[in-house]
Amino acid sequence: MGYEIFWTIKKYDDATFDRAVEMIRIVIDHRHKIDEKKWGICFDAGHENFCIQRNPLEGTYGSCKTRGRFPYTGDVMKALIVMVECGMAKEAGHNEPDNSLWLNSLEMVSELVELKTYSAQKAYFKREPPLAIGS
């Protein structure tokens, strides 16, 4: 049984994209190769790739359906935590009431890179019912 991870993309520039990619390379599992393309990046997210565009349209909605809690799900969440940190995404969340995977991902990311939004993201994921972060 899987669930859906979702987010809303905000408009950002190349410098922000490059900073986020650098951080994502640090925080995701190194076994998941990041493919750089002219239009953006992709990395393996289980049964599909998780992609981030270099030049997104304002308000693009994204989602990734998962099949259970495979390890790649945490990497998608880590990438979204970085995207919220860098101002690239907002309203990140999922349709499951248990936020432990988000909280664990947040802790792992914060151990590897400095997060100015750490307190806000942690407070969000501890709320009940869950609300979207980065609004």
Predicted regions and their residues:
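Acidic (Asp/Glu-rich) sequence patches and key acidic residues
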Residues: 1-135
